[in-house]
């Protein structure tokens, strides 16, 4: 899970934005 959030570039814009918000929270 952590790797996916940090690797937003590979996932894309939608995935990266969603993961970033979750990590910050």
Curated annotation (Swiss-Prot):
<feature type="compositionally biased region" description="Basic residues">
    <location>
        <begin position="15"/>
        <end position="25"/>
    </location>
</feature>
<feature type="modified residue" description="N6-acetyllysine">
    <location>
        <position position="9"/>
    </location>
</feature>
<comment type="similarity">
    <text>Belongs to the histone H4 family.</text>
</comment>
<dbReference type="GO" id="GO:0046982">
    <property type="term" value="F:protein heterodimerization activity"/>
</dbReference>
<dbReference type="GO" id="GO:0003677">
    <property type="term" value="F:DNA binding"/>
</dbReference>
<feature type="DNA-binding region">
    <location>
        <begin position="17"/>
        <end position="21"/>
    </location>
</feature>
<keyword id="KW-0539">Nucleus</keyword>
<keyword id="KW-0007">Acetylation</keyword>
<dbReference type="GO" id="GO:0030527">
    <property type="term" value="F:structural constituent of chromatin"/>
</dbReference>
<feature type="modified residue" description="N6-acetyllysine">
    <location>
        <position position="6"/>
    </location>
</feature>
<comment type="subunit">
    <text>The nucleosome is a histone octamer containing two molecules each of H2A, H2B, H3 and H4 assembled in one H3-H4 heterotetramer and two H2A-H2B heterodimers. The octamer wraps approximately 147 bp of DNA.</text>
</comment>
<keyword id="KW-0544">Nucleosome core</keyword>
<keyword id="KW-0238">DNA-binding</keyword>
<dbReference type="GO" id="GO:0000786">
    <property type="term" value="C:nucleosome"/>
</dbReference>
<dbReference type="InterPro" id="IPR009072">
    <property type="entry name" value="Histone-fold"/>
</dbReference>
<keyword id="KW-0158">Chromosome</keyword>
<dbReference type="InterPro" id="IPR001951">
    <property type="entry name" value="Histone_H4"/>
</dbReference>
<dbReference type="GO" id="GO:0005634">
    <property type="term" value="C:nucleus"/>
</dbReference>
<feature type="modified residue" description="N6-acetyllysine">
    <location>
        <position position="13"/>
    </location>
</feature>
<dbReference type="InterPro" id="IPR019809">
    <property type="entry name" value="Histone_H4_CS"/>
</dbReference>
<feature type="region of interest" description="Disordered">
    <location>
        <begin position="1"/>
        <end position="25"/>
    </location>
</feature>
<feature type="modified residue" description="N6-acetyllysine">
    <location>
        <position position="17"/>
    </location>
</feature>
<feature type="compositionally biased region" description="Gly residues">
    <location>
        <begin position="1"/>
        <end position="14"/>
    </location>
</feature>
<protein>
    <recommendedName>
        <fullName>Histone H4</fullName>
    </recommendedName>
</protein>
<comment type="function">
    <text>Core component of nucleosome. Nucleosomes wrap and compact DNA into chromatin, limiting DNA accessibility to the cellular machineries which require DNA as a template. Histones thereby play a central role in transcription regulation, DNA repair, DNA replication and chromosomal stability. DNA accessibility is regulated via a complex set of post-translational modifications of histones, also called histone code, and nucleosome remodeling.</text>
</comment>
<feature type="modified residue" description="N6-acetyllysine">
    <location>
        <position position="21"/>
    </location>
</feature>
<feature type="modified residue" description="N-acetylserine">
    <location>
        <position position="2"/>
    </location>
</feature>
């Amino acid at each position: 899970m952590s790797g996916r959030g940090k690797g937003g570039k590979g996932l894309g814009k939608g995935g990266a934005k969603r993961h970033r918000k979750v990590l910050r929270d």
